[in-house]
Amino acid sequence: TINNAVCGSTAYCGVDEAQGRLEIGRTFYDRAQWGRVVNPACKFLLLEYAFETWGMYRTAMRADSRNSRSISAITRLGATYEGTLRGFRLAPDGSRCDSMSFSIVHTDWPVVRDGLLTRIDPLRAVSQMDWDTGFDARRNSAAGDLVSDGAPED
């Protein structure tokens, strides 16, 4: 939550501890949060826990090949494109859609971590944020929204 309002969701799925892999997905955010700090901050927390606490070897993310915003957001996280899964799932309208597959492996994590920390700066204390009650990061005085120094954030 931000300012005690739900702003979206992202989650672990397909966790396979024996193989040291998981997927991060089921991500959606309120339009007001698109292009802001929420996605990189949330992904930082999930990736940090996956690699540094859980000891995962690999994390994966997928996006519908028609969803350029999601593809761009995943790419900006530092994930590597691995290929397209053709006809991978049924869309809500009943059509088949292709899913683009991305990953971050443990050897990528230090560079990805540093890139995410740079993007979410000045929120360097992201792992100590109180997501349930909001936090006092730099705010736009008119709207109370989180703002950055102009770095692309999504």
Where are the model-predicted features located?
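C-terminal "cap" of GNAT-fold acetyltransferases
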Residues: 88-126, 132-134
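Conserved acetyl-CoA-binding loop-helix of GNAT-fold acetyltransferases
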Residues: 35-49, 72
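A conserved beta-strand-loop-helix scaffold within acyl/acetyltransferase catalytic domains
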Residues: 1-20, 27
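A short, internal acetyl-CoA/4′-phosphopantetheine-binding micro-motif in the GNAT/acyltransferase core
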Residues: 2, 25-37
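Conserved beta-strand-loop-alpha-helix junction that forms the acyl-donor binding cleft
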Residues: 61-71
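Conserved catalytic-core motifs of GNAT/GCN5-like acyltransferases
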Residues: 62, 80-95
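A conserved beta-turn-beta hairpin within the catalytic core of GNAT-like acetyltransferases
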Residues: 15-25, 34, 55-57
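Conserved GNAT acetyl-CoA-binding A-motif
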Residues: 52-62
